[in-house]
Amino acid sequence: MTLAMILSLVVLVAMILMILFDVLPFGIPPLACCVLIVVLGSVFGSAMPELEQPWDISYAFAGFTNNTVWMLAFFMVILAAIQKTQMISRVKDVMAKLVEVGGFKSYVALLIVVMLGASILGMGSTAFYVLIFSLVVTMPYSDKLPGSKLMLPLGIASNHPLIPINVALQYGVAVSILASAGLQQSIPMVQFALVTFFLSLGFFVWAVIGYKFLPSHPVAEPTIENEEALFEGDGPSMPAWKEAVTIVAFVVSIVAMMLVETLGQLSYVIPGIAAVVMLLIKVLDFNEFRDNLFSPIILMTAGVIPVANCLADSGLSTLVGNAVASAIGTGVPPFVLLLIFTVLCSTFACFTGSQVGIAMIFTPLAIAVCQGLGYNPMAAAVAVVLSAWAGHYMPIDGLPAMAYGMGKYTMAEFWKYTIPQYVVRLLFLCAGAMIVFPM
C-alpha cells in the first residue's frame, strides 16, 4: 500500500468512527474529514507524487461544487414547499377513514396510501414517518385494526414509494459515486426509479404476507410531539394560486431531473429556479429556504464525495476490489455478489444510521469488485446505494427505533416481522437491479 492509500484509509476510518459513536452532529463528520484531507495533504503532499490532484481546499471540498449536490439541495427546498400544500392533509384524512373501517382490506389500502405519499416525499423523509407514527398513536384502539398491526408496516411503508417519481436523494448519491469511480456510464433516472419500484414491490409483498405475524395490542400513548406533528399541516392553508404554483414547481423539477441527459446543465438548475420562485412568492421564508438548502443530509452528501474521491484516486478502492475479486474467484454468480454487498451496506447503515455515508463507502467497493470480475457494475451501483435505505431490522436509529418503542413490540415480535421483510426486500432489489441493468 502506498502512503496515499494509507492516509485515505485513515480518513475513511475517522469518518466511520465519528458517525458510529455520534461524536459530532449528523452531517458534520464528513465535513471534519474534508478538513482532515487538507491537513494531510499539506503535511504529506510531497510524499504522494502519484496523486494527479493534490489534497488541497478545492479537492477536499469539491462536493460543494458538484452538479448533483446542488440539484439535490435545491430540490430539498421544493420538498419543504410541497409539504405545505393540502396533499399531506388529504393523506391524513384518507388514513383516518380507513382506520375507522378496519380489517385486512383497510390495512392493504393504508399501505398503498402511505406508499403514494412516499412517492411525493421520497425515501427517508423523517417528517413523513413521524407524521405516520403520530397518526397511528392518536387513533383509538380497535380490535378490527389495532395500532400494533399498523405501526411497523406503515412506518416502513413511508420509506417505499409506490410510484418512484421522487428518487432525487438516492439517485444523486449513485450519480456522484459513479463520477468519483471514474465511470463514463450514466444512470437514467427512469431506470433508477424502476429498480426502486422492485424494492418497494418486495416490501409490499412481505407487508401483505406479514400482516398475520403482527401482534394485536395497544400502542404507546400520544405525546405532545405526536399531536404537534399530526396537526402541523392543519393551520391556515395557502392561497389556491400559490398551491398550484408549488405543485407545478415540484412536477417541473422532477421532469427536469429525469431529462438530465437531454437538458444537460439546465436540468441541474431548474430545481434552483423553482426554489427561488418559492421564496419570491413567500411559500417559504428565508430561514426555511436556507435550512433546507443546507440541510444536514446535503452537508453529508457534499462532504462524503471527497472522501470517496480519496479512496478512488489513491487506488485503494481498486486495490481492495481486485483483492476481493481474487479471493472470491470467478465462480460467484452476479446475483450472489450483489446480495453480499447489499447485505453489508444495509447492515452498516442500519447500525450507524448514516445511509449516505455508508453507501459512499460500499458502493465504490462493489463497483471495483464487479470490474475486477468483468461484470457490468451498473447494477451494483444502483442496488448497493438503495440497500442503504433497506435495513430496518434493528431498532437502533430513527424509523425502526420509533416504530419499536411506540408500537410497544417485544424484540421477538419486532424481528418476526422485520427480518423476513429484510430478506425479501433485498432479494427483490437484487433481482430488479439485474433485470434493469444486466450484468
Residue ranges of each PLM-predicted region?
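Hydrophobic transmembrane alpha-helices of multi-pass small-molecule transporters
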Residues: M1-M71, V77, Q191-N322, Y422, ...
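Transmembrane helix-bundle signature of multi-pass membrane transporters/permeases
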Residues: V77, I112-L116, L131-L135, L152-I163, ...
